[in-house]
């Protein structure tokens, strides 16, 4: 589950036809000096402990009117369904990145570590990779009038998020043996759902949150300014600014039953921001499912689940490219991608080329299956118009229907390997 200078006048002219590769960004609101973060009696609090699951069917909400960050599964998850809150950012250079995901998920209960975990990746320009998959004792999600907040904590470490109800601001904090600090996010994009419709409290189509059968999605922040400031246990400070966003995922079953793989992208180029999901579904009617959002100066241009050419509906086309310099280690050897967003009603198209430039993380599952994350160079814009250059993050996966438990122990079980986990994961990614 995926941002160069703020000067607007930087223009590089190339050979005829004249095209301006410009670098600029949407202007997000400044992060406030303080956020109201007090939990009181006006808040509804959902608590979940590490080994708590609901026996039998529970309440699984697919409502398009519920706030995107609200708890979707009540009173708690059961043995199959799960939910996740995800936040990510990439530096303006594209060399440093951060991804943080909070999950309530019993998919890997056989580890004996519980159902609460935090996935945490930081990649730095010098090649340093910090990978955390931390199993936590308890989690709280507070749904308050002005914000939604979550805390995943154990006696010696804590991770938290705080998102305002208007989806403009988010603050993330982490305090563990490996890294301490946080990051802020400021966005002026409106929240949207999987079908491209804007989220409103009045609701939308009944299936508006569904990407593929069993998998549901809300886009809280399509594009946001990100400011990261953290310190490693070694004393080294990590600080960068960039672009990123936030998404919500919840599903009826584990990933291996839901799909054989996915490709996820968050990118920006000049005033454009792109968020795209491509899922090869296994449930219901197996096949390819897409959800794409294209913003211009933080206003939605195209939002659609249509992945083929249409004369009437907005659509998005996606193609893998193989002519670049960098690919993943596993079966999928693409070196980049091309996106084409189209709006027949506006008689306009937008095209963007994305090329992998940095491998951020990889995890293998054997026999060529696995997951790869990349930082990317992005170039594009309106067809026949000004072209812009930017950066992006992508993640691609390809999974078998079944993974032997010993391999899952290696791939996902590193959360309790202790301080040597990063070195173990590097070794595992090459072995598998």
Curated annotation (Swiss-Prot):
Keywords linked to the UniProt accession:
Glycoprotein, Isomerase, Signal, Virulence
Q: Which InterPro entries match?
A: DA_C (IPR054499)
| EC main group | isomerase
* Entry keyword Glycoprotein: yes
Pfam hit, one: DA_C
Q: Which residues form the signal peptide?
A: 1-20
Highest taxon listed in the record's lineage: Eukaryota
Q: In which pathway does it act?
A: Mycotoxin biosynthesis
Its Enzyme Commission number?
A: 5.5.1.-
Record flagged with keyword Kinase: no
> What family does this chain come from, according to its entry?
Belongs to the Diels-Alderase family.
What's its job? Hexane cyclase; part of the gene cluster that mediates the biosynthesis of pyrrocidines, fungal natural products containing a macrocyclic para-cyclophane connected to a decahydrofluorene ring system that show potent antibiotic activities toward Gram-negative bacteria. Within the pathway, pydB functions synergistically with pydE, pydX and pydZ to form the cyclophane.
How is this protein named in the record? Hexane cyclase pydB
